């Protein structure tokens, strides 16, 4: 709508989305980590709509499936930039963000308090809590999970490589 209330009908519009990784927590599970530290995700900008027109009431609906090829480490934040072009070429801009769940289920891990220097001793049992949730944060019971535990080796900062998760 224009500022005076009439519909902005039949104007050209375009929408782009910028995706970033976010550490969004689920309600009641704020102490759990739902991010995969092995997956790297760089900011990506996607064209969503280009050269589409608003209808007679000044609206435009769209549904877009984002193919991320299972590269997202967890929840994503999508920032949408919309532009609506006037007949003379000027445009109005709107920006809004939404959290996007790239997966139907998420597994979270809650680590116990570590010892000094954020370490766990290898000669004692350490219990981690796991939870499986739907994309809406509801418990997803009876899901089979495969869990692997890795011992991290300490390195000097200058000998760090991509094979080092710490």
Region spans (language model):
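A structural signal for beta-strand and strand-to-loop patches characteristic of beta-rich domains
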Residues: 1-166
């Amino acid at each position: 709508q224009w500022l005076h209330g009439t519909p902005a009908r039949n104007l050209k519009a375009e929408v782009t989305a910028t995706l970033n990784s976010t550490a969004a927590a689920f309600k009641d599970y704020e102490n759990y980590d739902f991010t995969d530290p092995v997956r790297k995700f760089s900011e990506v900008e996607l064209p969503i709509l280009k050269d589409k027109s608003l209808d007679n009431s000044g609206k435009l609906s769209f549904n877009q499936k984002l193919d991320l090829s299972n590269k997202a480490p967890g929840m994503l934040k999508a920032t949408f930039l919309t532009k609506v072009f006037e007949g003379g070429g000027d445009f109005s801009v709107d920006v809004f963000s939404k959290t996007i769940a790239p997966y139907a289920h998420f597994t979270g891990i809650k680590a116990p308090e570590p010892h000094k220097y954020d370490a766990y001793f290898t000669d004692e049992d350490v219990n981690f809590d796991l939870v499986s949730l739907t994309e809406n944060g509801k418990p997803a019971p009876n899901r089979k999970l495969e869990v692997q535990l890795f011992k991290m080796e300490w390195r000097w900062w200058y000998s760090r490589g991509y094979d080092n998760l710490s």
